[in-house]
Design a protein with these regions (language model features):
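A cross-family phosphate/adenosyl-ligand binding-site feature
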Residues: 1-91, 98-186, 190-202
Length: 202
């Protein structure tokens, strides 16, 4: 979709996918600890700078452990530090086993996270890590992207507005043969149309 993506991993997530894989896909450095893992030239990974860099923050998968720490303000890894420092919209995609998903404490966690102003991406029904099948599977990546896109579009100031923009040269007849015109390229009209579309207009 053209977005510039930076990845922040938890220590546990590296047991499922390597930082190199995500770095290759995102074409950016992957952050997983407060300092770089190069022992010879370790550098501080400033969680505030990372948080302020993004226009939005997606936590996927959001495990029961991570979500409970988001609620309590626990800050024992880089991801949680970035979350607490983020001023941009935050989306989270829950992922856990069926019984964990249905547990009252999890429902309470959802409510508190949503009350904080975060956006919950609905979990899906499917095969779970336990081998069982049911609600709690993380939304598919394409569904996460679609959810975020729709949520952004719904908040745009020109949503559901229809705008007519003329572009290009104009001609005013003097008589059946002659006219007054101009050499307009239409670029201004195209620019206005693109700007209106980016604000949600049709």
């Amino acid at each position: 979709k053209g977005a510039n993506v930076k990845v922040v991993m938890t220590p546990a997530s590296k047991e499922f996918v390597t930082p190199l894989t995500l770095s290759t896909l995102s074409k950016n450095e992957v952050y997983s600890s407060f300092t770089s893992e190069d022992d010879d030239n370790a550098q501080w990974n400033n969680h505030v700078d990372i948080a302020q860099w993004g226009d939005l923050f997606i936590i996927a998968p959001a495990t029961a452990n991570t979500m409970s720490k988001m609620v309590s303000g626990t800050c024992d890894n880089l991801l949680l530090a970035v979350y607490l420092s983020a001023k941009c919209p935050v989306y989270y995609a829950p992922a856990m086993d069926l019984d964990m998903y249905k547990h009252p404490s999890t429902k309470d966690t959802f409510k508190k996270l949503n009350d904080f102003g975060n956006f919950q991406i609905p979990a899906e029904v499917g095969e779970l890590a336990s081998g069982l099948s049911g609600m709690g599977r993380m939304a598919e990546p394409q569904n996460i992207v679609s959810f975020v896109e729709k949520n952004i579009l719904d908040q745009l100031p020109l949503k559901n507005k229809c705008i007519l923009i003329t572009a290009g040269p104009t001609y005013e007849s003097i008589d059946p043969v002659r006219f007054i015109g101009n050499h307009s390229s239409g670029k201004m009209g195209y620019a206005l149309a693109e700007a209106a579309a980016s604000l949600g207009a049709q």
